[in-house]
Amino acid sequence: MKGAKIVFIALVAAFLLSEFSVVVSAKPSKTSWTFMVYLDADNNLDPYGPLNVQQMSTGLMPGANVNVIVLMDRLDQPAYLYKVTHDSVEVILSLGEVDMGSSKTLAWFVKYVLKKYSAEHYLLDLWDHGGGYRGVCWDESSGNHLSPHDIETALTEAEQNYQVKIDIVGFDACLMGMVEVCYELKDVTNIVIGSEMLIPGYGWPYESIMQYLSANPNVDPCTFSKEIVEQYVSYYANMKSAYFVQLSAIDEAKVPEMAESLNAFADHLSQNIDTCKGIIADARGASQQKFIMGTMGVYYYIDLYKFAEIIKEKAEDEVVDMLALNLMKEIDAMVFAEDHINPQGNLDAKQFGLTINFPPNLQAYSSGYEMYVQCFVKETTWLNLLMTYYKAT
């Protein structure tokens, strides 16, 4: 009888252990995406911040395999860290006043999210006013903002801490679809999403973006980037918006090849400035986009592809023709998604996805350029072309 009991107990134990092993092996699947939003509404965009967060919550489906984490700082209000789910916005942390224009704040946010909300893929959305090479996220309480170099510094720190590279850095901010911005971020992200143009206050269409991500949690970063570009432009087209809107998705792996072609193109123009200065002036004028941004200054950016295309058409120089064509091909390779609408008809409807800084003269040039995009200035010869052109004209 004792032996029978032992056998029975052994059988029960074996059964329980087998059941337990099944439970342990059934680990929950890793979250597919973490969508982190660095939402700096500490300025006149304050009303749009809560609106966009609500759109995220509305768009997320119940049980979506997605983390949506938002750091929002509003005008004259403390900052909060939120976890957004279907029809719910939960406060994770109350942070008091924070400086959204500090790279330290951005680094803290990204590191916190990487630690607490790990996923297969990550998107960082930088939300606020944008100024192209000058940066993004102007904090009116501190007076500071994030330059592209600051963003690179923060993301480098986060990557070194957690060995994770952000898949997509998106800018829900004006004018950030620039060569200089992409160059500065080439080592810290795989894809940049940004606009050559101004972005309306309503920003990205977060409800439909979250609906898509909820329904397609295993989407790859490239496909997701294309979807964001398409949805953004469709959103304003359906609104019958009066805004010229444009958005690009850029493959950061292609930046070094583009920079090499840009250097060769710029060097040849600089070395032949006396014969090229006239066509440079014509091409610059035809491709310029001038933006007057109140206290944020005046921006003189040109569509780089269009600039090279006009140089190619006007130059009576086979070398210039070849170098311009090479640059155009590299830009085409970088910009893997682009869309725009031009309801006003007062701008050239053809946009190619990337601008570059080219003020009309030395008086309009800002020396801040050399500080805000340090890597680009040091490692390319574009600035040398600008200075050579200014001296010659």
Predicted stretch roles:
Residues 27-120:
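N-terminal extension/subdomain marker
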Residues 113-133, 137:
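Active-site groove signature of glycoside hydrolases
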Residues 34-39, 67-72, 122-126, 167-171, ...:
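Structural recognition of the beta-strand scaffold that forms the well-ordered cores
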Residues 1-28:
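Secretory targeting signatures
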Residues 41, 72-77, 129-130, 173-175, ...:
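Short beta-alpha junction loops
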Residues 28-30, 132, 137-393:
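Terminal, contiguous helix-loop blocks that mediate binding/assembly
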Residues 11, 118-120, 165, 188:
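Short loop/turn motifs at secondary-structure junctions
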